Amino acid sequence: MNQVDYLRISLIDRCNFRCQYCMPEGSELNYILKQQLLTDEELLTLVQEVFIPVGFRQFRLTGGEPLLRPHVVDLVGAIASLPQTQDLSMTTNGFLLAPIAQNLYDAGLRRINISLDSLDPHIFDQIIGSHGRPRWQQVWDGIQAAHRVGFDPLKLNVVVIPGVNDHEILDLAALSIDKQWHVRFIEFMPIGNGELFGDRGWVSSAELRQQIRDRWGLTDAQVRGAGPADVFQIPGAKGTLGFISQMSECFCDRCNRMRLSADGWLRPCLLNETGQLDLKTSLRSGVSIHQLREQVRHLLAIKPEINYKGRDSGTTGVYSRTMSQIGG
């Protein structure tokens, strides 16, 4: 079991997109009321006084869409300025990124993941549920802005949906050839989208790699990330290709992360709700910082057992919560 030192922090559960795999059409979404969200002060207290003292050093800001969080640049700056913060990154859909990319970089954000599920504007809008409002170009502008500012690595996340965007694998992989961009293919997962998943299923990373290997060849990359991706490279390419295979290749034994939801629930496992802690309620009811630390330490100690119990759930489980409610 890897050392667990990576915390994914959901800043908000709301999003300006409604992607099929994250917030499926027809599903009832009960958004968190503003007063139920962790405040900036509460979030920083938990990071600085609870998570860092028990060993967390890497933080990723997620959503929903994190750029919808008021004062997000200030929050980035506050976390980045903590001397114990070794790595601060963000996952965003990129729609609001272009105007504030430089501000985020100046505040201390250095790594960014941007969702790009298609290079075809029509298919892209279909996936994100734009209802006729074109969104692709503004996302692409956000990607270009992040590249100009100097985010490194700049990662592009692609959720592969059979019959929707799986024919674009080679075109998306080609983005890694001329720029130091890291394209990551993510297997479609049945979390909060059981009807869509049951209708379409998923494409394994092995199949995707074979397509790319047949076109260009494929080698193991010299650079390895801190997460679950298996990293490869097209020979001669500047960037890399990552494959996140939560459906076909269990990586629970490599898990190094926990998730903090926007309303303060600490979740040790994406697939298993065992042991989750309501830190916000505890904090607001006067539970001491020392007690909160000890609760998190205990959860860290039992996380391997929780992971083991959840390892087969990716292919057999049914989940009522959407990815946006979990925090991605």
From Swiss-Prot:
Catalyzes the cyclization of GTP to (8S)-3',8-cyclo-7,8-dihydroguanosine 5'-triphosphate. S-adenosyl-L-methionine binds at residues 21, 64, 115, 189. [4Fe-4S] cluster 1 binds at residues 15, 19, 22. It is an enzyme of class 4 (lyase). Its cofactor is [4Fe-4S] cluster. The gene is moaA. Its EC number is 4.1.99.22. This is GTP 3',8-cyclase. Pathway: Cofactor biosynthesis; molybdopterin biosynthesis. Binds 2 [4Fe-4S] clusters. Binds 1 [4Fe-4S] cluster coordinated with 3 cysteines and an exchangeable S-adenosyl-L-methionine and 1 [4Fe-4S] cluster coordinated with 3 cysteines and the GTP-derived substrate.
